């Protein structure tokens, strides 16, 4: 049995206290605790505590320390329950203490996966124009439950998905001006798949793109690639030249009619 002889505020940290005890051989330093632990255990001068109680105090001190670490981690941005658990494990906090800390954080509403998922969907759809499947995968990696993700994605209606997908198309299609319409369409489709949009949404956007097809741009692209391949293959004669030109331009996404029209033009020029 020991008796608390003195409680002293630490000089550098006003919320921490040094506890001095007497085990029958005079006053000695016992341990230090956070203010929350001091209050929880009602520590005061003259209080008698045994080894079991001291062990309990020190355990709660570790819990409080981990709790404050988690609060600091959460102060920068919202986190999921799994992210906080992983952070504490990296800090070499024991699983029993992590469980207690998570329970307290949930109770105090410092972590809430439902609120996190809704905010994440809004941010990723409005700011980064990501598609639903990519957002779903990212939330799953963060440990959010499938049912919560499905509910949160209701914040991302199909109309908004189409708007975002078409916005991405408008930004990207400028870089494909020297490609055939078919090749540009394929590249844009691949980009939207990577961004997480459904086939249905992509099809709607590509149909709109088809209606906006600029024949003059298609012709420019045909002339650009056609003249490039013409210089490359003009050393060949007859069928070999024609076959190589057709294969090269067809791979670039031009139709047979477009290719034959170009070859006819070059023939008339030549």
UniProtKB/Swiss-Prot annotation:
- Residue ranges the record marks as coiled coil: none
What does this chain do?
Modulates RecA activity.
A GO BP entry is: regulation of DNA repair
The entry's family comment says: Belongs to the RecX family.
Specify the species: Bacillus cytotoxicus (strain DSM 22905 / CIP 110041 / 391-98 / NVH 391-98)
Name where it's found: Cytoplasm
Main location as per UniProt = cytoplasm
A Pfam family the protein falls into: RecX_HTH3
What is this protein's name?
Regulatory protein RecX
Question: What cellular-component terms does GO give this entry?
Answer: cytoplasm
Q: Which UniProt keywords apply?
A: Cytoplasm
């Amino acid at each position: 049995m020991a008796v608390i002889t003195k409680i002293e505020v630490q000089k550098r940290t006003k919320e921490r206290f040094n506890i001095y005890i007497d085990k029958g051989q005079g006053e000695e330093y016992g341990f230090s605790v956070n203010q929350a632990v001091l209050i929880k255990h009602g520590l005061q001068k003259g209080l008698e505590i045994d080894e079991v109680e001291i062990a309990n105090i020190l355990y709660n001190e570790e819990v409080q320390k981990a709790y404050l670490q988690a609060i600091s981690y959460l102060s920068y941005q919202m986190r999921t329950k799994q992210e906080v658990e992983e952070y504490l494990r990296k800090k070499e906090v024991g699983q029993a203490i992590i469980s207690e800390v998570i329970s307290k954080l949930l109770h105090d509403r410092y972590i809430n996966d439902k609120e996190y998922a809704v905010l994440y969907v809004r941010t990723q759809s409005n700011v980064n124009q990501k598609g639903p499947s990519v957002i779903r995968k990212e939330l799953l990696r963060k440990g959010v439950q499938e049912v919560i993700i499905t509910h949160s994605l209701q914040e991302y209606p199909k109309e908004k998905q189409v708007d975002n997908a078409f916005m991405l198309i408008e930004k990207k299609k400028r870089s494909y001006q020297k490609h055939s319409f078919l090749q540009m369409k394929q590249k844009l489709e691949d980009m939207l798949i990577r961004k997480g949009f459904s086939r249905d949404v992509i099809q709607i956007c590509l149909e709109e793109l088809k209606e906006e097809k600029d024949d003059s741009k298609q012709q420019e692209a045909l002339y650009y690639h056609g003249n490039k391949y013409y210089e490359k293959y003009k050393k060949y004669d007859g069928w070999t030249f024609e076959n190589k030109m057709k294969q090269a331009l067809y791979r670039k996404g031009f139709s047979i009619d477009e290719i034959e029209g170009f070859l006819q033009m070059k023939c008339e020029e030549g």
